[in-house]
Amino acid sequence: MIRPCTFGIEEEYLLVNLGSGQVPATPSPAVMGRCREALGRYFAQEMFRSQIELASPVFTNLYEAREFLQRNRQRLRVALAEEGMGPYAAASHPCAAWLLQKPAAQGHYKQLFDDYRHVARRSLLNGLHVHVGVPPACDRMQLINRLLPWLPLLLALSTSSPLWAGQPTGYLSYRRVICGEWPHMGLPEALPDWAAYERYRALLQRTGALAADGDLWWALRPSRRYPTVELRICDGCPNLEDVLCIAALFRHLVEHSIAYRHDPLPCSRELRWIAQENYWRAMRHGRHAQFIGCHEQQPVTAQGWLAQLQAQIPIDSADAERACQHALHVLRHGTHADQQLRCLAQARADGLGKGQALRAVVAAGTCI
């Protein structure tokens, strides 16, 4: 029997000036006060002074998630508008002066910038993170190994970072390209079980590569604070329905992987090769990529891959059905990355200068 899992969602936002479209290096105390007042206990400061996080409570269904995110996104929009600001949710800003940004004042963020220097300064990026709760007896590393092949499809559904420094990058998720500059931020390591994971952490800590309370930043990781697996690969999504789709689809994959966790895994080495290749293709081409099917190992479109998912993992809940329907819509009509590129092209075709065209892209990236 498939038992529903609880889940939670974390969204990162940059604070942008609604007039100029730019990200201020140091938002005013009034702006930060508006954020804290609007989000209350769900507010968190992120690694830049101009970046915040909305961290949800635990949900049991998609209705709860939609109601919470709608309400808090709206409260944040209204509060920030009073200061001429807005929450920007796409994964990268098309023209932010990232070299001028300031790290958040909290000590652990200062340590990040001291340790990683230019890599940290360049990481002016928004991600979408989804936690799904798992039973205590579940080996979360084995669960991650089962989920690994599907990660590139989830990235392809979320891409929203095609522009950087005022230019198209050629990648639909340039955010994940920058993430690749960090240690321990790619796909999860090939560790067969929880015992191997603990040995791996112990080795990193013993050799000074990881602090005692340090985190790994894998694209999918076991949370150190909660009994969850945490999806981290996805770009931030301005469109709320895209967020809900990804959260529900990931939860669906987790539930079925837990239910069938005693079944033998297929050849994990080959699946890892395929996952790594598909990951690059999702970064580069997003929904337009020709992927490699996980089992038959033949080329497949993103829509074909979604169809394979539905055939292999039967849709058995209303939330999962809605997620698959919306995922198909996204794969047919485009992610926010596609929307940004269309917006930029249309603005230039309409005769707008580069700066005005980029401001139009920023306007499209605020929360909706």
Curated annotation (Swiss-Prot):
It holds the Pfam family GCS2. Keywords: ATP-binding, Ligase, Nucleotide-binding. The keyword Nucleotide-binding applies. It catalyses: L-cysteine + L-glutamate + ATP = gamma-L-glutamyl-L-cysteine + ADP + phosphate + H(+). The keyword ATP-binding applies. One of its GO terms (biological process) is modified amino acid biosynthetic process. Gene3D superfamilies: 3.30.590.20. It is an enzyme of class 6 (ligase). GO terms for molecular function: ATP binding; glutamate-cysteine ligase activity. Its EC number is 6.3.2.2. NCBIfam families: gshA_cyan_rel, PRK13515.1. ATP-dependent carboxylate-amine ligase which exhibits weak glutamate--cysteine ligase activity. Belongs to the glutamate--cysteine ligase type 2 family. YbdK subfamily. This is Putative glutamate--cysteine ligase 2.
